[in-house]
Each structure stands twice: as C-alpha cells, then as structure tokens.
Amino acid sequence: MSRILDWSGDELSSYYLDTEIDLSWIDKSSRHQFRWKSLKGPWITSDRRISSSKKLIELFSNSMPTDVYVSTSSWLDPINLPRIKDTKRPSPILLDHLVVFDIDIRPFCLIRLEEARKATLNLRNWLIENTDIKIRHITFSGSKGFHIIADDPDRESFSEPDPVLREEKVKSQRKQLLNRVIEGGHPVDKVVTADTRRVIRLPGTVHGKTGWVCTILNDEWIELPVNEWINKIPRHDSAIKIPKRPPIRIPKFSLSKMNLRFPSKKIASFPQYTSLELSSHVSGTNDRSAFVSWLPRKWGDIRTSIELSLIHI
C-alpha cells in the first residue's frame, strides 16, 4: 500500500453527511447489530436499533468512524448482546444468519485483486452448481477482496426452540458448508462463514485503510477483469491510488547465515591483515557503493576474524 491514510473528522463527516447508506439489501436492519471503529480509537457498538441510513449516520456525529460493520446474524434483540459464554444473562434468540464467504488476497493492488476476483467467480459458480444456497450479491470490500453474501433455504436449524442449541446447530451447518468449500480448494477465510457473531464491512461505507468505498457489485462485474470496472467504484477524495502490482520486496541478507567454506589446509605464510570486501555492485550498473575493511591479524584465522567482524558490522 503506497501510503497510510491519516483521517480527520472533517474528511469523514464530509462523506457521511452527504451520503445515504443503502440498507435495503438487509431484510430488517433493525434486527442486526452495527459496530464501527471510531476515529478517536475505540470500537463502538450501536446501542439503538438501526432502521435507516439517517439513524446510523446520526450515531456517527459524536465520533466519526474509519470502518463500519454489520452483523451476519439477525436477532430478536440485537442490542447489548451477551457473549456466547455468558451464562448469567438470557441467551439471545437467533432469527437468521447470512451465508458469507470472504476472499482476500494481499496486498492491495490490481494484480492481486484480479486474482481475488477470479477466485470469487470460481466459488460463486461452484456454489451454484453444488449447493442450494441463494446468492444475494457480491461485494467489493474496498481493499483486498470480495464478500459473497447468500441465504440458505434450509431453515431446519432455526426450528430448534432452545436458543443455545439453535445457535450451535446453525454454526455446525455453516461449518459443514465451509469445509466443503475449503476441500474444493477455494481460498476463503476459515472463520467468517461459520461464526454467528461475526460482523462484515457495511456496503456504502469507507474502508479506513484505502479510502475506497465497500460496494455491492453489479451482477456482471465479477465476470469482467477488475481494470474494466474498478474506476466505477466510489471512493473518498483522500483515497489512495490502487497500485498495479505488489511492491518489490528485497529478501533479507545475513552474512551470519551464509555457508562459508574455507580450505582446511594450513596456509604457509599469513599476511598481517585479512581483507574483507562487500559490494552491492551488479554487472552492468554504475555508481554502486562498496564496503572494504581490513581485519587485524590478531583476531585469528580467516574464519574467526570474519565471525568477529560480523559482530561489529
């Protein structure tokens, strides 16, 4: 990633105060939990039911968010949900759970995003051919990949009256599907799909690390190369430019790990000094630097003197 965004409250508010976040893809948004990472630092979980974009953005006024998420599950009461292991409070009643697959390929660049698109397309086609789930849409996360959002028509697990057992059965059902997908060789996140308490990035909101907007794709876009539609994705004015390829990484070089081979024969006459020369010169280039050092004879033989020199380099 070319640079790190340093958001200000004014930059974020200029986007959200002029934007309507489309929640229509969620059957009943008031049954979902909304969370966001605030510009001030802490994570905030909505303490109100969210039924519209306006109500959600009103909650941002105290501290603008860098990243906004929504739960994959819907609950009878999504406010102040108890933790799974909390036995002191009544267990929440799970009403529905979206089937979500997350595919990310790092880093954020066109080449890796194209790889993620192809992987997402392959998974979409596999799901259509091998399962009964109904795909709602595919979302560009705003950074390194995509989310497939779907519904499972098999509602048998939700007929369980005990809320704890119901949630366990739904998780087990999702885990079985996830295992099939992984066994099929698809590079999906191994946690998101089977986690009933998971939150995913909310479409229509800014990705805090890139400035690009998490966006529901037109159905045909996932079948087209990324470079044919990426410029149609909305982004904040401060968004970073998406690199074409990953940054070049120079491998770490350590002389101490080199397999230095020295002759075992004794040298008849020893010079007063040992010369150690290191150079970054590459054939055909100019103006490359070189490091030359004389090592004291009193440091010992060649191997010992080089080992001692490495301590000082």
Which residues make up each language-model segment?
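Accessory, usually C-terminal, subdomains that scaffold auxiliary metal cofactors
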Residues: 192-214
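SsDNA-processing nucleotidyl-transfer enzymes
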Residues: 20-109, 113, 190, 250-269, ...
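Histidine-centered divalent-metal-coordination microenvironment in nucleic-acid enzymes
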Residues: 98-101, 135-162, 199-203
